[in-house]
UniProtKB/Swiss-Prot annotation:
Keywords: Ribonucleoprotein, Ribosomal protein, RNA-binding, rRNA-binding. It holds the Pfam family Ribosomal_S15. The keyword Ribonucleoprotein applies. The gene is rpsO. GO terms for biological process: translation. The lineage of its organism: Bacteria, Bacillati, Cyanobacteriota, Cyanophyceae, Synechococcales. This is Small ribosomal subunit protein uS15. Part of the 30S ribosomal subunit. Forms a bridge to the 50S subunit in the 70S ribosome, contacting the 23S rRNA. GO terms for molecular function: rRNA binding; structural constituent of ribosome. Belongs to the universal ribosomal protein uS15 family. GO terms for cellular component: cytosolic small ribosomal subunit. It comes from Prochlorococcus marinus (strain MIT 9215). One of the primary rRNA binding proteins, it binds directly to 16S rRNA where it helps nucleate assembly of the platform of the 30S subunit by binding and bridging several RNA helices of the 16S rRNA. Forms an intersubunit bridge (bridge B4) with the 23S rRNA of the 50S subunit in the ribosome.
């Protein structure tokens, strides 16, 4: 479940830290969250797709590590990102 170029560009524009930013932790978390959402929808209808489930768990772990990094570096940016993406209640 990959993202097309237009979706990626939109995510980059909404979460970038500076104008030429394409790979900051915030952008990576936003892209992972979108991919996780798409893959979760896929797994709702394909419950026996175990390889996709494994990939989903890897993406969730990576997002968790990136969020932990952001939280350690700047708690304010972490709180804004979580609110903007809509994760963690």
């Amino acid at each position: 479940m990959s993202l097309d170029t237009a979706e990626k560009q939109k995510l980059i524009e909404t979460h970038q830290v500076h104008p030429t930013d394409t790979g900051s932790a915030e952008v990576q978390v936003a892209m992972l969250s979108k991919r996780i959402s798409k893959l979760s929808d896929h797994l709702q209808g394909n419950i026996h797709d175990f390889s996709s489930r494994q990939g989903l768990l890897k993406m969730i772990g990576k997002r968790k590590r990136l969020l932990s990094y952001i939280k350690d570096k700047n708690i304010q940016r972490y709180q804004e990102l979580v609110k903007k993406i809509g994760i963690r209640g």
